[in-house]
Swiss-Prot record:
Mn(2+) 2 binds at residues 15, 65, 439-440. GO terms for cellular component: cytosol. It comes from the Bacteria. Monomer. Its cofactor is Mn(2+). GO terms for biological process: glucose catabolic process; glycolytic process. It catalyses: (2R)-2-phosphoglycerate = (2R)-3-phosphoglycerate. The active site is at residue 65. Belongs to the BPG-independent phosphoglycerate mutase family. It comes from Trichormus variabilis (strain ATCC 29413 / PCC 7937). This is 2,3-bisphosphoglycerate-independent phosphoglycerate mutase.
Length: 533
């Protein structure tokens, strides 16, 4: 007998689509979004928290895509690496971290140099500069004679020219502790690419590994000269300013804690079968990453991954159900690796499809990105009729929002809105239920109070809309479901399990957003047109 098609729950994550009443600098408010506006009017909706303690970050700390997807997939508030490592610096336990102490001993025994590589930023998304200060304290305590800092500048999770403040603070701390020097400077556009643009990684790698005394400038002078040419922190061209080449016998500590933008540069240093560009592997070279960037990398890890059990993908798999994940390159790791709690391998019954992002320098040049192809991929998965859960990420609001260009971001928002309309038609035909939400804010706030471009994330809440399916009945909730107003990202997984009528495991401490109803759940619902055609 042929199995009846599955009516799926489709989770749509609009990356960087925050909520803000202020319309100035608000690309979402300025965009024409008839689908989202109709859905907001016609269907149950709420605002949920995506920053600070609600997602395991310090109070007031903006959320990000990694943290957002981790919390969504885990169904609980996950203490973040930023807090974990900051606590180690604060309480001094970083000084006795076994992986960090060991690399210092190896470098000292070989009479080599210790290289500290990472994003010099207070953004708290990929790193924090206070973690670098902790490493300088460690190097001093371990009596390392030569400490070379390879500074990567931000301008994406911070203001575009905030790097000069971070570098100045670093120089002050170097003077205070009496150890270390900045030897190279590189914008994150080059050193932290995650889209296999190996030419960018090579620019940073070559500067770090090729001999040379440098041009003798101070790091702040490099930044000021770049600003004068209209080049902000993100795009600082890699440059050597002082001696300190990474070479045989040395040790490297990569102090970024977020994996996705740290993998490629690490691969260039340690992978024996590396093919991104021609290079001679440096041996021996001790290498420590702050967190686990990839289980296949031959490195030591200072802060081992937390073990998350009974996360959403695992629960779906254990129930013998199928699931599907899709996103374009920029966000693919988020709907797979991060959504699965840092696991690389898919669960049983979990299918994935990567859609390539367009090969452009910055996404304001192609604001539609690959949203249409992502939509096509998702609709094809829905039409198979075999998936109980489908997870989709639209990267446009976040990736174009990060450029600081409002007009292209408006175009990006409008593209996603059109794609949503088409996607929802497909879900409706399958009798599925759609949850539309975001992982953090961005595109709703693109000008600061002084009118300057804002390229970072925000602490604003994000929308969540429940588009109820024709065939799906949600026992105990009635036909006009209400949603709680105090929710957070950790509540999404329990909500999905609620809709699928699956038990919530005790490890999943989030709470379903669905409000119990006092009326007959079988009473017919009058479908409200939402302008999807």
């Amino acid at each position: 007998m042929t199995k009846a098609p599955v009516a799926p729950v489709v989770l749509v994550i609009l990356d960087g689509w925050g909520y803000c009443e202020e319309t100035r600098g608000n690309a979402i408010a300025a965009a024409k979004t008839p689908v989202m506006e109709s859905l907001w009017t016609a269907y149950p909706h709420t605002l949920i928290h995506t920053s600070g303690k609600a997602v395991g970050l310090p109070e007031g700390q903006m959320g990000n895509s990694e943290v957002g997807h981790l919390n969504i997939g885990a169904g609980r508030v996950v203490p973040q690496e930023l807090v974990r490592i900051s606590d180690a610096v604060e309480d001094g336990s970083i000084l006795s971290n076994s992986a960090l102490v060991k690399i210092c001993q190896e470098v000292r025994n070989r009479n080599g140099k210790l290289h500290l590589v990472g994003l010099c930023s207070e953004g708290g998304v990929h790193s924090h500069i206070t973690h670098l200060f902790g490493l300088l304290d460690l190097a001093k305590e371990q009596r390392i004679s030569e400490v070379c800092i390879h500074a990567i500048t931000d301008g994406r999770d911070t203001a575009p020219t905030d790097g000069i403040n971070a570098i100045s603070a670093l120089e002050d701390y170097i003077n205070h502790v009496g150890i270390g020097r900045i030897v190279t400077v590189s914008g994150r556009y080059y050193a932290m690419d995650r889209d296999r643009r190996w030419d960018r990684i090579q620019r940073a790698y070559d500067v770090m590994t090729q001999d040379g005394a440098g041009d003798g400038r101070k790091a702040v002078d490099v930044l000021q000269a770049s600003y004068a040419e209209g080049v902000n922190d993100e795009f600082i061209v890699p440059v050597r300013i002082a001696p300190g080449t990474v070479e045989s016998g040395d040790g490297v500590i990569f102090f970024n804690f977020r994996p996705d933008r740290s993998r490629q540069l690490t691969q260039a240093f340690v992978s024996p079968e590396f093919t991104g560009f021609a290079r001679q592997q440096i041996k021996p070279l001790s290498f420590v990453t702050f967190t686990q960037y990839d289980s296949d990398l031959s490195v030591s890890v200072a802060f081992e991954p937390q073990n998350l059990t009974n996360i959403l993908g695992e629960v779906i798999a254990n129930q013998g159900l199928n699931q599907f994940r899709t996103a374009e390159t920029e966000k693919y790791a988020h709907v797979t690796y991060f959504f699965n709690g840092g696991l690389e391998e898919p669960f049983a019954g979990e299918d994935r499809e990567l859609v390539s992002s367009p090969m452009v320098a910055t996404y304001d040049k192609a604001p539609a990105m690959s949203a249409t192809a992502v939509t096509d991929t998702a609709i094809a998965a829905i039409q198979k009729g075999i998936y109980s859960l489908i997870v989709i990420n639209y990267a446009n609001p976040d990736m174009v929002g990060h450029t600081g260009q409002i007009e292209p971001t408006i175009q990006a928002i409008e593209t996603v809105d059109r794609c949503l309309g088409r996607l929802l038609e497909g879900v409706s035909k399958a009798g599925g239920t759609t949850i539309i939400t975001a992982d953090h804010g961005n595109a709703e706030y693109m000008l600061d109070e002084a009118g300057n471009s804002w390229t970072a994330h925000t602490t604003n809440p994000v929308p969540l809309i429940l588009v109820e399916g024709e065939k799906v009945k949600i026992p105990g909730y009635g036909t006009n479901v209400e949603l709680r107003s105090d929710g957070k990202l950790a509540d999404i997984a329990p909500t999905i399990l609620d809709i699928l009528q699956l038990p919530q495991p005790p490890e999943m401490t989030g709470r379903s957003l669905l409000q119990p109803a006092e009326y007959d759940v079988q009473s017919p619902r009058t479908r409200i047109p939402v302008g999807l055609n």
